[in-house]
Amino acid sequence: MAPGESAQAAGLALGRRITEVFRQPFVLDTQHVVVSLSMGLVCYPEQADDPAMLLRHADTAMYAAKRAGRNQLCLFDRSLELAVQDSLRLDGALRQALSGQEFSLVYQPILLAEAGALIKVEALIRWHSPSLGWVSPDRFIPVAEESGLIVPLGRWVLQEACRQLAQWRQENPQSSGLRMSVNVAAWQLADADFVTDVQEALAANALLPETLELELTERTLIAEDPTIEQNLSTLRQQGVKVALDDFGTGFSSLSYLSRIPLDTLKMDRSFIAELESSRRCRDLVQHIIAMGRSLGLQLVAEGVETAEQAETLTRFGCHLLQGYHFSRPLPPAELAERYFQSRLPG
């Protein structure tokens, strides 16, 4: 509470100071810990004049801060109520969807730059709700992360992707060298059972660890959670591959290369989009590829939409290409029909 004539300004200033304090790591049982802080601010009496309404509006603003990426301060606005109501509807529908088999996976091919052969696929989740219709992942994934549903949802994606890979291999001898790439969220990686979840998904489908690649974003690594790093290290030692997605968009991209055990760098699609129009972007992409190759990492360019982009990336030495120039994400049967007629690398 910040009383006074300029309560809003005082509240914002105080909130920013508190947020900055919590951005700093602190020591807990000899471990450096970083916590995220989400704050909601509401002004009395302009926005509410009774305690119950003040708390409700502050709570609404706090959840808006969480949706903005955590470590945020948000001032209440009437429009936020609609967003919160939408999130609550989505949360309820998500819980029902998990038990109602409303989710499915599609798979986008990732190809060798020089030979054009299919090397691996990226599993992408889709949701068709009976009441909401098709819901974009950009809309429901943040809600799943806020509610904690991302852990069981991510577990289902992992299990289904491994099951599908095993089925392809059983039905199509040409797919024997195919690998599966699965996106994982920070909440999953920090879960105590995550390593077991991966091991069980592989064992249940008789898959070797090296057939699975886990994709994580730079945002996942910002908190420097020791559990995340330990889980990744354990799985990589067992043979599971690790890829850093959207490389180059974070503030500390280079630090991750020395801290996190990685096999693959996926360059952010924003670089690829400007490849032909920006000399600076071309130089940056060329340097990222050269750096990755010197570190023994596999380079993937996603968001490739033109033949010119593909040719430039191949000339620069990028190993793998992914994007609509080659294929949209496909249902399992369509992908098998299109790609398993030619031999995959073994």
Describe every region a protein language model picked out.
Residues 1-5, 144, 253, 275:
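Active-site loop/short helix in cyclic nucleotide turnover domains
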Residues 1-88, 92:
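Cyclic-dinucleotide signaling modules
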Residues 11, 15, 55, 195-198, ...:
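Heptad-repeat coiled-coil signal-transmission/dimerization helices
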Residues 20, 24, 60-63, 67, ...:
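Regular, well-ordered alpha-helical segments
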Residues 20, 78-82, 89-207, 219-220, ...:
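Bacterial c-di-GMP phosphodiesterase EAL domain
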Residues 25, 32-40, 72, 102-104, ...:
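Residues at or immediately flanking beta-strands
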Residues 31, 113, 117, 130, ...:
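EAL-family c-di-GMP phosphodiesterase catalytic domain
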